[in-house]
Amino acid sequence: MPINPLYLFPNLFTASSIFLGMMSIFYASSYQFVMACWLVVASLILDGLDGRVARLTNTTSKFGIEFDSLADVVAFGVAPSLITYFYVGYNFGRIGMAVSALFVIFGAIRLARFNISTNTSDPYSFIGIPIPAAAVLVVLCVLLDNKYHFLEGNTEKLFLGFIVLLGVLMVSNIRYPNFKKVKWNLKLFILVLIFLSLVFVRPLEALSVFMGLYLIYGIIRWIFLMVKIIFNKNKSA
């Protein structure tokens, strides 16, 4: 059965994401953490392109969806997990191993849940923080420490705790914005230009602030919703 060459095009982006994820693992295993971390960020860019290319070329397929999920496990599950272990996790023996493994497991659960709920969930939000966002938050912490050296002593334990938190957030019911479905307008276009300018000037700091706000947004929104539900229950009681 002949295959339309156009179907290969978006999958090349997905395959490239896996390749960069593997390169990230290799660099991390040789303690070249800066390169390893930026490769995960580069994988995020490719991950955002494959779906768009598939939609633009009208080559969306079930194979592409499953292939993308497998790529995400490698690039955003295994790669940041091993970066975490080689960077600080090994100092804590089996605890470090367990934390690194749990991140991959929770990420795989997150992807499986996403695949079976794609047609029923709100297209403008994700249930649980997306695994690419969690992965980028991990590598940004490593890059920030490489530059500012804040992970020492007890803060290494906090970093492992942060990894566990990200894993829990991935399988939680906390909703996060889906920027792939955002509606473009002039105001948003200007904001994106400002953000890209900041990324050009201070890439690490700008990305860290943006991703930090993204992380906190979901948690604060969830807290407000819980407070509202409790208040309404007490009011109706």
From Swiss-Prot:
Membrane topology, from the record: Multi-pass membrane protein
Presence of keyword Transmembrane: yes
Main location (coarse class): membrane
Keywords, alphabetical: Cell membrane, Lipid biosynthesis, Lipid metabolism, Membrane, Phospholipid biosynthesis, Phospholipid metabolism, Transferase, Transmembrane, Transmembrane helix
Enzyme class: transferase
InterPro entries: CDP-alcohol_PTase-I (IPR050324), CDP-diaglyc--ser_O-PTrfase (IPR004533), CDP-OH_P_trans (IPR000462), CDP-OH_PTrfase_TM_dom (IPR043130), CDP_ALCOHOL_P_TRANSF_CS (IPR048254)
Reactions accelerated catalytically: a CDP-1,2-diacyl-sn-glycerol + L-serine = a 1,2-diacyl-sn-glycero-3-phospho-L-serine + CMP + H(+)
Protein location: Cell membrane
UniProt GO BP: phospholipid biosynthetic process
Transmembrane feature ranges: 3-23, 25-45, 73-93, 95-115, 124-144, 150-170, 184-204, 207-227
EC id: 2.7.8.8
A single MF term (Gene Ontology): CDP-diacylglycerol-serine O-phosphatidyltransferase activity
GO CC annotation terms, alphabetical: plasma membrane
Family: Belongs to the CDP-alcohol phosphatidyltransferase class-I family.
NCBIfam families, alphabetized: pssA (TIGR00473)
Name of the featured protein: CDP-diacylglycerol--serine O-phosphatidyltransferase
